[in-house]
């Protein structure tokens, strides 16, 4: 984890935040751009560090020239989207996709033995796609090359989000707060909160919840399997929200506020509310760029359900290259479809909130469903299936 290294704070965060505060408005984007480039190169494979920076710049310059000198056309938008997706597929999904055809890696002519993931590729790919689509739809201004590269290479959010929007980031970049004391106090507090979650909760539970295999499942007392699953749910929430806390706090040191990502999702009483409060920047991105373009809730019932399933198929694939992540995403899609069907049959009472016992039952069902689905997030499909057979059958 980059966020728990002294190098992150002493070599990058503190010096860059101070320089950004002292820089003129014209030079701030360059400070963020250059510090982000150095950060990326330092914490990734240095022989590939320049490749991604060049790709970022190339994609932006292409879209910039088109939007400046030519009337935007749909093929330009699709070209930008396609090249960005291919870039992600090449690095993240190549071995997984070719492995579906050639199960034996030794016989796979397309297998990339030394495959690696460029730092933050899943996050900055979604930011690329957002920019390409929103520029085409004129939902955001173009900005300068330095401002765009500062947006992409803003290193506090590069590793683990939150996923930013250009039109939200740009005004904050141009009008950085001069309230040093308040920003640094709140930023440092948020960073410390994240570190406590990471070391005091997530890492403690990691020793217990990680590396569960079929032999462990076979030996375990069945009720302990359920305890293990709920412990993993707490661990992954503490882990993910810790990254977000540190990223949000780090951005605050620059005087820039980025989107919140987690808002007590496990306290929500239905799966819809859970996703409105879990990884919120990702959920909003999926709604705006997958669900709504597919037709959203404007279509007939069956089409709406299909839109939900496709959206969460994308969510699963985004989280990881494996069939288990697809299953995990589809399980959440199915839960959302069932919730929507149920509300068509049993609408919420018009006279006020549901009774307490109903809310409690709904919360328990949601909490159980979310945690049971985690099995496919942390295990391959075969091991997760055996886990459930052992848990429910014996």
Residue ranges of model-derived segments:
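Membrane-embedded transmembrane alpha-helical bundles that form the catalytic cores
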Residues: 1-394
């Amino acid at each position: 984890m980059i966020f728990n290294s002294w190098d992150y704070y002493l070599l990058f965060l503190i010096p860059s935040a101070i320089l950004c505060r002292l820089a003129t408005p014209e030079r701030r984007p360059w400070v963020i751009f250059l510090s982000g480039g150095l950060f990326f190169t330092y914490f990734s494979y240095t022989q590939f560090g320049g490749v991604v920076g060049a790709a970022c710049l190339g994609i932006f310059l292409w879209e910039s020239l088109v939007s400046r000198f030519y009337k935007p056309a749909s093929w330009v938008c699709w070209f930008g989207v396609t090249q960005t997706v291919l870039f992600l597929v090449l690095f993240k999904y190549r071995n997984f996709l070719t492995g579906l055809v050639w199960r034996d890696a030794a016989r796979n002519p397309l297998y990339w033995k030394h495959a690696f993931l460029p730092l933050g590729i899943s996050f900055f790919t979604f930011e690329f796609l957002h920019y390409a689509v929103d520029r085409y739809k004129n939902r955001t201004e173009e900005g300068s090359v330095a401002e765009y590269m500062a947006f992409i290479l803003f290193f506090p959010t590069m590793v683990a989000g939150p996923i930013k929007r250009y039109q939200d980031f740009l005004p904050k970049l141009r009008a950085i707060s001069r309230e040093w004391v308040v920003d640094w106090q709140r930023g440092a507090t948020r960073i410390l909160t994240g570190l406590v979650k990471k070391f005091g909760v997530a890492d403690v539970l990691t020793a217990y919840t990680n590396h569960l295999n079929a032999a462990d499942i076979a030996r375990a007392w069945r009720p302990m399997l359920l305890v293990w699953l709920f412990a993993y749910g707490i661990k992954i929430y503490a882990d993910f929200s810790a990254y977000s806390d540190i990223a949000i706090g780090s951005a605050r040191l620059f005087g820039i506020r980025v989107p919140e990502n987690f808002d007590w999702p496990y306290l929500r009483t239905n799966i819809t509310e859970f996703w409105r409060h879990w990884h919120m920047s990702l959920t909003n991105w999926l709604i705006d760029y997958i669900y709504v373009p597919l037709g959203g809730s404007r279509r007939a019932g069956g089409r709406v359900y299909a839109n939900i399933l496709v959206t969460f198929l994308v969510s699963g694939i985004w989280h990881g290259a494996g069939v288990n992540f697809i299953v995990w995403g589809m399980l959440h899609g199915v839960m959302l479809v069932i919730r929507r069907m149920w509300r068509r049959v049993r609408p919420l009472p018009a006279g006020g909130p549901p009774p307490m016992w109903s809310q409690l039952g709904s919360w328990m069902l949601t909490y159980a469903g979310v945690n049971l689905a985690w099995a496919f997030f942390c295990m391959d499909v075969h091991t997760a299936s055996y886990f459930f057979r052992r848990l429910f059958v014996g």
